[in-house]
Amino acid sequence: MSTYLIGDIHGCLDELLALLAQVNFDPQQDTLWLTGDLVARGPASLDVLRYVRSLGPAVRMVLGNHDLHLLAVYAGISRNKPKDRITPLLDAPDADELINWLRRQPVLQVDDQLKLIMAHAGITPQWDIETAKMCAREVEAVLSSDSYPLFLDAMYGDMPNNWSPELTGLARLRFSTNALTRMRFCFPNGQLDMICKDTPENAPAPLKPWFDLPRLVDPEYSIIFGHWASLEGKGVPEGIYGLDTGCCWGGDLTLLRWEDKRYFTQRAFKAEAEINNNNGFAAGEEVQH
């Protein structure tokens, strides 16, 4: 009985299955944590959703910004971009079923026994665990409700970028969504910067990665995140684990076995140059909310 944590899959089903085969994953006994962005950019978003859904309670996942963007495209709010390669999913006979399953997935996972927290982008240094749980529940409640298209239409935007308990309504939901699914850099006071997409060493002062600022989260808890492929899982403090290693860009899909902290990787089956030439986008490009 093992706990496996895997970074952003982005429609790379073959690599996911090969990686799970390396560790003899057994959905009857093991638990699979997924950092979000199951879809877009890779070749098999539809089959990834079908497979992950088929695993039932063996999976603990969170939604990423690309998953939310898919929901917005399906709702007719955002445009379907060819480079995302999600048309087969949108046209699938079980699309309604998959989309309704996806929008009921959480944006935050907390396991008090394992002392694990997982969010796609991380946890803003302005939140403690209880605030993160509260804000995540608010986003999840509206996503799973009949009014979810209203939220999806309002989630695009970078403001507000500073947490306050006084935030309300769609502004509060937008901040929470950005903090949980898009965040990379913060100002020294914890305010989000939603512009810089660079590596930490190339970021302009005074920006710092969210994980390098003093945080309110109980240090007994480890934080698992994806989203930031250019980190390649490196340069993070003890107790922080970045698992997105850019499989859809020609990099690796990375798995961390929690019990012994051992990493396993599966190289992308297509080289980065081939992927980029076929799809016409640059590594690191992301959906803008």
Swiss-Prot record:
<dbReference type="Pfam" id="PF00149">
    <property type="entry name" value="Metallophos"/>
</dbReference>
<keyword id="KW-0378">Hydrolase</keyword>
<protein>
    <recommendedName>
        <fullName>Bis(5'-nucleosyl)-tetraphosphatase, symmetrical</fullName>
        <ecNumber>3.6.1.41</ecNumber>
    </recommendedName>
</protein>
<dbReference type="InterPro" id="IPR029052">
    <property type="entry name" value="Metallo-depent_PP-like"/>
</dbReference>
<comment type="similarity">
    <text>Belongs to the Ap4A hydrolase family.</text>
</comment>
<dbReference type="GO" id="GO:0008803">
    <property type="term" value="F:bis(5'-nucleosyl)-tetraphosphatase (symmetrical) activity"/>
</dbReference>
<dbReference type="InterPro" id="IPR004843">
    <property type="entry name" value="Calcineurin-like_PHP_ApaH"/>
</dbReference>
<comment type="function">
    <text>Hydrolyzes diadenosine 5',5'''-P1,P4-tetraphosphate to yield ADP.</text>
</comment>
<dbReference type="InterPro" id="IPR004617">
    <property type="entry name" value="ApaH"/>
</dbReference>
